[in-house]
UniProtKB/Swiss-Prot annotation:
One GO BP: oxidative phosphorylation
Chain's role: Component of the cytochrome c oxidase, the last enzyme in the mitochondrial electron transport chain which drives oxidative phosphorylation. The respiratory chain contains 3 multisubunit complexes succinate dehydrogenase (complex II, CII), ubiquinol-cytochrome c oxidoreductase (cytochrome b-c1 complex, complex III, CIII) and cytochrome c oxidase (complex IV, CIV), that cooperate to transfer electrons derived from NADH and succinate to molecular oxygen, creating an electrochemical gradient over the inner membrane that drives transmembrane transport and the ATP synthase.
Keywords: Heme, Iron, Membrane, Metal-binding, Mitochondrion, Mitochondrion inner membrane
Main location: mitochondrion
Gene for this chain: cox5a
Record-given protein name: Cytochrome c oxidase subunit 5A, mitochondrial
Membrane topology: Peripheral membrane protein
Pathway annotation from the record: Energy metabolism; oxidative phosphorylation
Source taxon at top rank: Eukaryota
Amino acid sequence: SHAKVETDEE
């Protein structure tokens, strides 16, 4: 959702 904030770029 953000650029590598908690590994939630899916």
